[in-house]
Amino acid sequence: EADRMMEALDWIIWEMTDEETRSACGAGYKAFYRHDTGYPSNDFFKALDPRMEHFIEEKMDAPIKSIGETAGYLCESMARQLGLLAGTPVGTGIIDAHSSLPGCGIGEPGEMMIIVGTSSCHMVLSETEAGIPGVGGLVKDGIMPGYFGYEAGQCCVGDHFAWFVDNCVPESYAQEAREKGISVHQLLTDRLKDYKAGQSGLLALDWFNGVRSPLMDFNLNGMIMGMNL
């Protein structure tokens, strides 16, 4: 039985400060937290499983900190490990993809950033809140303080490519990549760079992990059409 449930980013901050807090980013995008109403009600969790009725107060309840806010101060034990001064301010944690916006200088509305990795995250800041079908993430102060952070995208991108390379590429391609000293991914990219859209005759629907935007249905499946021998 778990004593506490939290995102890794909150655990790291807890270890550094010896104070348990929760990031508005992690709580909002991953645990349904809203700035005005908090977490879902006990009835919501009870409907999932009667044993979860008091899940929030028993496993997750802690002060919520906005991005850019001081979460606490470096504790003595961690200061010794890191060679830093105890009492050094420690910022609130942020999810990896979401940190890309301030890291790339996007600090106000009007610009969208697409972060592509295992999944793809399409993120944009706004001064206003609006429920938009197909946009699964909307958190106040979740990316930059003072703004609503919108998140859409797809839940299967890099892992889709990895699956294809591991399961659908002939050994001759793998051998060629080894001889050239490049990855199979790079070999496929080189072979396809002069192809026009649709030239191969293949059609692919990239819902192999379901679809995030715009349908928000993780029970849907992907497919590849047009293959022959």
Which residue ranges define each predicted feature?
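Active-site core segments that coordinate phosphate-bearing ligands/cofactors
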Residues: 1-22, 30-55, 68-229
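Dinucleotide-binding Rossmann-like beta1-alpha1 core, especially the glycine-rich loop
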Residues: 26
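Long, well-ordered, tryptophan-enriched scaffold segments
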Residues: 58-59
